[in-house]
Every structure is written in structure tokens, then in C-alpha cells.
Amino acid sequence: LSYYAPQTDVAIELGGEDAKIIYFEGGNVEQRMNGICAGGTGSFIDQMASLIQTDASGLNEFAKDYKAIYPIAARCGVFAKTDIQPLINEGATREDLSASIFQAVVNQTISGLACGKPIRGHVAFLGGPLHFLSELKAAFIRTLNLDEEHTITPDNSHLFAAIGSALNYKKESNTTLSSLIDRL
């Protein structure tokens, strides 16, 4: 990010099985990452999509036409299912359920990782779910009350971890087997 979007104050990155909030303050980097559970990540979104008989991109399309947001727990897929099933039984639309699932991811990420620390300034959105699911990103932008000037969506944001690794790669040096053995 320091190369592609140096104005970034906070990065939110969602992956298939992890979520991160990274604060950039005065040259310091503070990274907060979810623990052992994949609640609020791409795999959570896939699990919830299957409950309403679609996939992640289907959720995204449905969420474009939502009318209401229902509270859904995103901390754990099991708890979320117990919130969603009664809503399905009561006739909640797939549009409303889809937007509610995305809002649950937003709420889990913000409450579980920011833990009260403000997310403000220029915010970058990274990772596959935020790259491919426009309505998930829109839910973050709405919740954080960001304007276009403070929203950073780099090209290839779903590949940013790989791009960062490539930029940090140091040229390989030639080493003999005997020198490696000596180092051990």
C-alpha cells in the first residue's frame, strides 16, 4: 500500500478464511486479524449463500435490491444459521437476507477487529470478497460513512497480498551447498 496508495490510513482486508484491519499511523503499522474462527470472511459468505440457495455472486446481485436489513450474527456460521433460518421461515426476501448477511460481515469486522478504535481517513478495501462483491464493499462504505475521496479500491485489490510479497522479494543469491551446511 505504501507504493500504490500511500495516503491509506486504514486497510480492511477480507480473505477466504481471515479478516484484517491494518492501521497506518505516523510510520507505525498495527495489524489486527481474526483468530481461529472464519466468521465474517469469504467462507462465511459462501456458507450463508448456500442457505438461500445461491453463491456469493448471487448474494451480491440480490443485495442490490434490498429493502430491509435484519440483525444476523456473523461471529460464527452456526449462530448465523440460527438467525437466518427463522427469517427464511417468516418469508424474508433473498434480497433482504443477502444485504443482511453482508451487513453482518461489516459489523463483525468492525466490532471484532477495530474494537472501538476509529476507522477514519483514507480507507483501502482489499481481498477477494471486497473486490468481487460490490454490495459488501458498499455496506462497509455506508457503515463507515465514507465519501468517494476517502475510499481506496486499488486495481487488483484481490491480489494485494501477492503483489506485496512480490514487491518485498529480495533477489536470490547464489549459494553453494557447502556454505549452507556451514551456516547450519
Model regions and ranges:
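Glycine-rich phosphate-binding loops at beta-strand->alpha-helix junctions
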Residues: A114-T143, P154-H158
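Conserved phosphate-binding catalytic cores of ATP/NTP-utilizing and phosphoryl-transfer enzymes
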Residues: L1-I12, K20-E30, I110, A114-C115, ...
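Internal, active-site/partner-interface "lid" segment
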Residues: D55-P86, S178-R183
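Adenine-nucleotide phosphate-binding core of ATP-dependent small-molecule kinases
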Residues: A80-S111
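Glycine-rich phosphate-binding loop plus the immediately following alpha-helix
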Residues: Y4, G26-A68, L167-K171
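Glycine-rich phosphate-binding/hydrolytic loop that grips phosphoryl groups
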Residues: I45-Q47, T153-L184
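Active-site nucleophile and cofactor-binding loops and adjacent substrate-binding regions
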Residues: I12-G16, R32-G40, S100-F102, L130, ...
